[in-house]
Amino acid sequence: MAGGKGKSSGGKSSGGKTSGVEGPKKQQSHSARAGLQFPCGRVKRFLKQNTQNKMRVGAKAAVYVTAVLEYLTAEVLELAGNAAKDLKVKRITPRHLQLAIRGDEELDTLIRATIAFGGVLPHINRALLLKVEQKKKAKAQEA
């Protein structure tokens, strides 16, 4: 019937699927669907616990926050791994984390926390460096 008002073709339709015979789909977590390693469900639970007045938290918000946390963690670990490799050790210590974070300008402004056992960055004032270099040049000219 031309108007779309009429009986269906009968039987069960495939619902737009290409093959009618498929088993049940395997369950995937939100993290697996988003291609993340960090747990979206746990982050969503923390977001719900820390909001005031029992606010609702959308699933996409939790995925977004999880992706940001995962990216920042990967960035810090990559820089800390490079710092450890430069010092020819295989284990990342708080000192390597400190060197990595303070060495990157954007991470330094983001993470203003004090890192336990991180030490301090080596820094010598330029005025002092100039005096030392001038003395070395004077000794080199005398010799």
Swiss-Prot record:
Compositionally biased spans, kind Gly residues: 1-18
GO biological process per UniProt: CENP-A eviction from euchromatin; heterochromatin formation; nuclear-transcribed mRNA catabolic process, non-stop decay; regulation of transcription by RNA polymerase II; silent mating-type cassette heterochromatin formation; transcription elongation by RNA polymerase II
Region named Disordered: 1-37
Keywords: Acetylation, Activator, Chromatin regulator, Chromosome, DNA-binding, Nucleosome core, Nucleus, Transcription, Transcription regulation
Chain coiled-coil ranges: none
Residues modified to N6-acetyllysine: K5, K12
Complex formation: The nucleosome is a histone octamer containing two molecules each of H2A, H2B, H3 and H4 assembled in one H3-H4 heterotetramer and two H2A-H2B heterodimers. The octamer wraps approximately 147 bp of DNA. H2A or its variant H2A.Z forms a heterodimer with H2B. H2A.Z associates with the vps72/swc2 subunit of the SWR1 chromatin remodeling complex. Also interacts with rpo-9/rpb1/DNA-directed RNA polymerase II largest subunit.
Post-translational modification: Acetylated once deposited into chromatin.
Gene responsible for this protein: hH2Az
Protein name per UniProt: Histone H2A.Z
Organism this protein belongs to: Neurospora crassa (strain ATCC 24698 / 74-OR23-1A / CBS 708.71 / DSM 1257 / FGSC 987)
Protein localization: Nucleus; Chromosome
Major location category of this protein: nucleus
